[in-house]
A protein has these predicted regions:
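Active-site neighborhoods and metal-handling regions in enzymes and metal-associated proteins
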Residues: 1-354
């Protein structure tokens, strides 16, 4: 269950922005010959519903129905006592409390005789109980996967989303500064200090992972144990603000190599170009960092119901040309003069850092 404050701020996320997103979604639906669109959500898959409505699901299963016209319908198994709170964070939808969201979705669809074909985001991962209930209540409907359509819609961010991402990034960057303050000598204490800093700044959720001895093990782990920090360690902060997630990773070391790699990586994040393979861009940029060898990289973005998912990586060459205006979190692992270094930062392709 989420622990941070969740609320809707009309200045940060105006109703006009949500209405514009809904209009774009309906235009994409029409182009794909979909008469309605269904999105499944829970506490680990909140992002698609948040993008359309502003509401961040925090527990339980729920379904959202986007019809061709009229208000979206958000059907949740949560009790009625939270309905009013949901309404304060979702200014567009009709909120319905029901123990069987799938059956309700199907019943709503059958009331409109023009509905023949319905898209479902990430159809293959829709829980079978909900899928069965929808199909039983609307046996004449043709169900189809709408993931590609929605992914195309999410390739560019609007100004409101960019502002929320920038706010989350500022929280993460400032919180990681706790590692420079010398307040902690062990991983558990440092993780607590970083999380505390981010939450007091307004973070909705945080996940802190640490590689306490980067020279021995590059894996980043969530920990509360008093494991001593070594001369070279790395910290990753995944932070959410108003439903928008970012990641930052930094390497901390007593030598000057980490700072040189940080400066290089900042330039990479600010200069990533659209239409060109990320692998080729990194290879070219690596020439500007003498003594460096690239180990791996991954680019993540929010394209569906999950906050961040891999969209390109060093494991899948040839499919990594980003789109102008696309939000990415770029993570790079390299060695500099034989010493390991990890870094991650958010960016907008073709427009630089957030």
């Amino acid at each position: 269950m989420r622990r941070g404050l969740m609320g809707w701020n009309a200045e940060e996320l105006p109703v006009a922005t949500l209405e514009a997103r809904l209009t774009r979604l309906r235009a994409a639906m029409a182009k794909a010959s979909m008469d309605a669109f269904v999105i499944y959500t829970n506490n680990t898959r909140p992002s698609a519903v948040h993008y359309v409505t502003g509401f961040t699901p925090y527990w339980s299963d729920a379904l959202m129905l986007v019809p061709k016209a009229g208000a979206p319908v958000f059907a949740t198994a949560l009790s009625k006592r939270v309905s009013e709170w949901i309404r304060t964070t979702d200014p567009l939808s009709e909120i319905v409390n029901t123990p069987k969201p799938g059956a309700l979705m199907g019943e709503r669809l059958t009331k409109d005789n023009s509905v023949k074909r319905v898209g479902v985001l990430e159809y293959d991962t829709l829980p079978s109980g909900l899928a069965d209930d929808m199909a039983a209540a609307a046996p004449a409907v043709e169900w189809t996967d709408g993931t590609a359509m929605f992914t195309g819609l999410r390739r560019e961010v609007d100004q409101s989303e960019r502002g929320l991402l920038a706010r989350a990034d500022a929280m993460a960057a400032a919180a990681l500064g706790e590692a420079e303050a010398g307040k902690a000598s062990d991983a558990g204490t440092l993780a607590g200090l970083i999380e505390q800093h981010a939450r007091l700044a307004g973070a909705e959720e945080t996940y802190i992972a640490i590689a306490h001895d980067l020279a021995a093990d590059r894996r980043l782990n969530r920990t509360s144990q008093p494991t001593p920090l070594q001369d070279r360690f790395a910290v990753r902060a995944s932070v959410a603000y108003k439903g928008c997630w970012i990641r930052r990773t930094r390497t901390f070391a007593k030598d000057a190599g980490a700072a040189k790699a940080d400066s290089w990586f900042d330039g990479v994040a600010r200069s990533l170009e659209p239409g060109k393979p990320i692998a080729a861009q990194l290879a070219a940029k690596l020439k500007e960092l003498p003594g460096a060898a690239l180990t791996s990289w991954i680019a993540e973005s929010c394209t569906g119901s999950y906050p961040l998912s891999a969209v390109a990586s060093s494991r899948a060459p040839g499919k990594d040309a980003p789109v102008n205006g696309q939000f990415l979190v770029l993570t790079v692992e390299l060695t500099l003069d034989g010493a390991p270094w990890l870094g991650a930062a958010p960016l907008i392709v073709g427009q630089g850092a957030l």
